[in-house]
C-alpha cells in the first residue's frame, strides 16, 4: 500500500511538470557571430563520382498531367495572377539542377557543386520538377507554374546519382558534413547573384544527438536573409517514402503540455531538419493533401512555418522537350506519384515571388510575415505540423495587414535581423500548473500518510 502510494506520487510529480529533458535537448540554433559566410564559388567540395544512371521523370500510365491537379486548384492561381505574375523576381533553385526547355525557358546558369557544369543539367529530375512548380510556363493545357513571369537561377547542389570518391568514418555524418558545406556555399552564391527568393527542396536530417558543425551554414543563411534580403524557403522533410530525392527523416513528438514554457517543444526534438531548423531565417514548409489536410509523411517540428500542397503533383520533366510529368522512377523503374515537402516548398517560393513583385517595398522578413499572417489557420497558434496554416496565394497578395497601412508599397526599409518572437506571457498557465502540481503532491502525501497510519493499526500477520 505504501509503495503504491509513493508510486502514485512519483507519477503525479512527473505529470505535473518536473521533467528532465534528454541530454541532447536542443533549442533554436544561434548564428555564431565569429563565423564568416563561406565562399560561394561553385565547384565540387569533394571529388564526386557517378554511381547510377540518370532518372527522367514521366507520366504515370492512365493519367494526364496537363489536367489541373487539386493541388494547383487549391491555390486559385488565376485569381492570384490578377495581382502579380512574379515580374522582376529572380528565384534560386538549390537542388539537383534544372533542365531548361520550352516550359522552362527563363533559367539562368548558377553553377554546379556536384560536377563542373553550369548547373543547367538535371540527372535526377527533382530540381526541374521544383522549378516547374515555381515558374513553369503555361501551355495549351491546364498546367502553369505559380510565378510564370519570374526568372529562375539553377544551382546544382546535390544528386543521388553521385557520391564522394572517398569516404571515411561514419557515412551518415560524413555525408551530412558534405551536404552542409555545399548548402552553405550554394546559399551564399545564390544571394550574391541577386536571388530574392531562395528555394531549398533538398534537406538533410540528423538525430538531435548526432549533429555536425553548422557554423558556416548559419553564417551563410543569415548573410542571405539579412545582408542580402532574400526569402529562404525550405522543405520541412519527409518521414516516409515519397516522390522526392531527399532521404527519409524521423518524426518528432508534438507539443508537450507539461512544458508550457516551450510551446513548440524544442526540448523534445529527436530529429533535426537542415536547413529548416535555422529559425527565424528560414521559412520551413510542410505538405498538405489535395483536401488541405496535413500529409502523413510531412515531418513535424518546431521550425515548421507554413503548409502547402505536396501530394500528387504535376510539373515539368527533365526530358528537355517541355513535356509534363507526374512521376519519378523508383528503384524498380516504376513511376511513382510525386509527393513530398520538396514540392510544397516550391509552391511557397512561387507565392513569395508573387508577393515580392507586388510589394517591392517589403523586406524579406515582412514577406514571410505576410505569407504566414494570411495563411488559413488550423489552430489559434502555430503548430508543429502545419505552422501558421495553409498557404493562401490570393490573401497574401490582397490582405492589408495592420502593420502595413500603405499596403506595403512604401519605400524599402533597412533590412534588420528577423525578430525573434517575444516570449509569451505564460504566467497564468504556469501558476495553474504550479497549483495543480502542489495539489497533486499534497494529495499524494496525504494518501501516503493515511496508508502508513492504516498499516500501523492493522494486526501483524
From Swiss-Prot:
InterPro entries: Peptidase_S8/S53_dom (IPR000209), Peptidase_S8/S53_dom_sf (IPR036852), Peptidase_S8_His-AS (IPR022398), Peptidase_S8_subtilisin-rel (IPR015500), T7SS_pept_S8A_mycosin (IPR023834). Residues 1-25 form the signal peptide. Its EC number is 3.4.21.-. It is a single-pass membrane protein. It is found in: Cell membrane. It is an enzyme of class 3 (hydrolase). Induction: Constitutively expressed during growth in culture. The keyword Hydrolase applies. GO terms for molecular function: serine-type endopeptidase activity. Its main location: membrane. GO terms for cellular component: extracellular region; peptidoglycan-based cell wall; plasma membrane. One of its GO terms (biological process) is protein processing. This is Mycosin-3. It comes from Mycobacterium tuberculosis (strain ATCC 25618 / H37Rv). The gene is mycP3.
